Amino acid sequence: MSEKSASSAPHRLIVIEGPIGVGKTSLARRLARSFGSELILEQADENPFLERFYRNPRAAALQAQLFFLFQRTRQLEDIRQHDLFDTVRVADYLIEKDRLFARLTLDDEEYALYDQIYTRLAVDAPVPDLVIYLQAPVDTLLERIERRGIRYEQHMDRVYLEKLQEAYARFFHEYAASPLLIVNAAQADFVSNEQDYTQLLEQITRIRRGRHFYNPLKSTL
């Protein structure tokens, strides 16, 4: 796939979303290279509470969630300080995911505190021109998590992933803020398989509005 210039990109802000291990960041990196665009990534390795959270979720859920909230808010403020129309950007998260994870990991008292902080931050996130929601079965997520080899993820709880997957499905069932492409990423390899990636890119460049579903043809390459 030849690289395109930023001026040829079909969207100014593309966001990739989906549960842990589905391939958001890898796809975001490749799209950014294709379009010559700025890459906005969640910096999970900077969160000092994340490893503790995976060992004992109840002991560090609030700290881990607030760290991500502040980190994401800073990144979005940086975007707002620049003219969104002058730069093509690809991101591997929606700010709305912050509340999604908070609902899943915090108890009622913690969530009430989190919600107060979120409200006071008055997060004003730019609206994406396209959101790509990657889906895959939990078994596939676990395989990919094991394969990428991040130490603190290696004991990821299956039940947690199942709940996370359900939360994403509910969220995107109602999502209407941007054009949405829902992709079955169970068997596709958008990083190493050129056919898989090219076919997805064709879908991305065609979408201007509405909700779309894409089930990649199994590659014979």
Where does each model-flagged region fall?
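Glycine-rich phosphate-binding loop used to anchor ATP phosphates in small-molecule kinases
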Residues: A60-P126
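Conserved substrate/cofactor phosphate-moiety recognition/catalytic segment
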Residues: R29, R33-Q71
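NTP-dependent small-molecule kinase module
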Residues: E146-Q154, E162-L221
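P-loop (Walker A) phosphate-binding loop of NTP-binding proteins
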Residues: P19
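A glycine- and Lys/Arg-enriched "phosphate-lid" helix/loop adjacent to the NTP-binding pocket
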Residues: D98-A169
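Hydrophobic anchor at the beta1->P-loop junction of P-loop NTPases
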Residues: I16
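Extreme N-terminal, non-catalytic leader segments
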Residues: M1-R12
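Conserved lysine of the Walker
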Residues: K24
